[in-house]
Amino acid sequence: MFNDIPVFDYEDIQLIPNKCIITSRSQADTSVTLGKYQFKLPVIPANMQTIIDETIAERLAKEGYFYIMHRFDEDSRKPFIKRMHEQGLIASISVGVKACEYEFVTSLKEDAPEFITIDIAHGHANSVIDMIKHIKTELPETFVIAGNVGTPEAVRELENAGADATKVGIGPGKVCITKVKTGFGTGGWQLAALRWCAKAARKPIIADGGIRTHGDIAKSIRFGASMVMIGSLFAGHIESPGKTVEVDGETFKEYYGSASEYQKGEHKNVEGKKILLPTKGHLSDTLTEMQQDLQSSISYAGGKDLDSLRHVDYVIVKNSIWNGDSI
């Protein structure tokens, strides 16, 4: 029964250190394998229009990071795949589940992307299962990520349909208001939901949403994630696609949810909002700091790579990260 499982979130958990076996944090290996490919970090900038664009996607791919291009400029996806392949880079795109997306997937047979993410808010749906099967029939070599979900049953169904990885998280993100608008979601217990889903998974799990600090990446891996999708920590950079806004002499970047009226262009079935984030330097600096912090996490775990994080003990201490405990 669900009511028998412990419920907690990132701020409620502290990982317990083990004896360090490396002489320098720089020796810790933060690389991760997804499908046939290895990447520098187990993190993915959220496939949102204010987080990633083609320029950032290209740069991430060149530097060895994983990315997922958003699906909100449908006509540009095919040229994007071609351009990435011409440079010898992986192509990783998103699709929805509308009828036109079936034709689009079929049209990719001659130049199939390495990764496709089926990206809808409630991924435990027949429409997602049908799309997984369609992609696997038309593009059998393409790695399929499906989501988003929040239960073990959903993970098993999507895996059984052919998904190569599932994305876990229903509304825990900073600009998502699903739990407020609908009463449903994993907001406030995202880490426990991740643990619950990971126990049922046979394939990689991607934790999506609720990441507020770099330490949350290590916690996600401890509780079963292979990779971690992050929105707000990747928003607000100088090169971020979000619109630049000046307020009282200060510079901000817009950051809004994929189900917001700003993304949809209409006030209908809105489950996202828009916020302004202070501009915070370059994306490369954040990626470097994330890697260094994750290397420190590995050193505290007593290992040499990400796998060591999966075996550490932990304690549940309610609201152990609270008043002002931020980077």
UniProtKB/Swiss-Prot annotation:
Stated name of the protein: GMP reductase
Enzyme class: oxidoreductase
InterPro entries membership: Aldolase_TIM, GMP_reductase, GuaC_type_2, IMP_DH/GMP_Rdtase_CS, IMP_DH_GMPRt
HAMAP family registered for this protein in UniProt: GMP_reduct_type2
Top-level taxon in the UniProt lineage: Bacteria
Protein residues bound to NADP(+): 205-228
General function of this protein: Catalyzes the irreversible NADPH-dependent deamination of GMP to IMP. It functions in the conversion of nucleobase, nucleoside and nucleotide derivatives of G to A nucleotides, and in maintaining the intracellular balance of A and G nucleotides.
Chemical reaction(s) catalysed: IMP + NH4(+) + NADP(+) = GMP + NADPH + 2 H(+)
PANTHER family: GMP REDUCTASE
GO MF assignments: GMP reductase activity
Annotated Gene Ontology cellular component terms: cytosol; GMP reductase complex
Lineage: Bacteria, Bacillati, Bacillota, Bacilli, Lactobacillales
Keyword tags: NADP, Oxidoreductase
Catalytic residues of the enzyme: 176
Gene3D superfamilies: Aldolase class I
Transmembrane segments: none
